[in-house]
Amino acid sequence: MNKRSLGSTNFEVSEIGFGAWQIGADWGVEVPTDTALESLSAAADAGVNFIDTADVYGAGRSEKIIGEFIQGRDDEIIVATKMGRATSDWNDSYDEISKAAELSCKRLGVESLDLVQLHCI
């Protein structure tokens, strides 16, 4: 799998990433957790080290599954998460962003987030 530098970061990410919207099961058929973990493992085995998710995917379910997957390998996998749509009263204040980041860290089981994107802002 080819890798590229991610902007001005020190991250080397795979040219193909794993989009984790569906494992959150907002719409369509719910993906069982074991199937989601198998899919993430298959992607990692193929060289994918970049996962894209959001706090709103399955009301945090996607982040929780990814958190389970990256335990013990979080230095190998780069996770990009999005925030800004989980509540209808979202604002882009420091407090709101800090709270959303803290909740994402908790679901992912990490101390800090690799990459944060503001969702539909």
Regions found by a protein language model. Give the residues of each.
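N-terminal binding-site loop/beta-alpha segment at the start of enzyme catalytic domains
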Residues: M1-I77
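Non-cysteine beta-strand/loop elements that form the S-adenosyl-L-methionine
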Residues: G19, I78-T81, V110, L115-V116
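Active-site beta-loop-alpha junctions enriched in small/polar residues
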Residues: W21-I23, A54-V56, K82-A86, L118-I121
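Active-site mouth loops of central-metabolism enzymes
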Residues: Q22-D34, M83-S98
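Generic beta-strand or strand-like secondary-structure segments
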Residues: I65, F69, K82, E96-L103
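Glycine/proline-rich, positively charged
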Residues: S88-I121
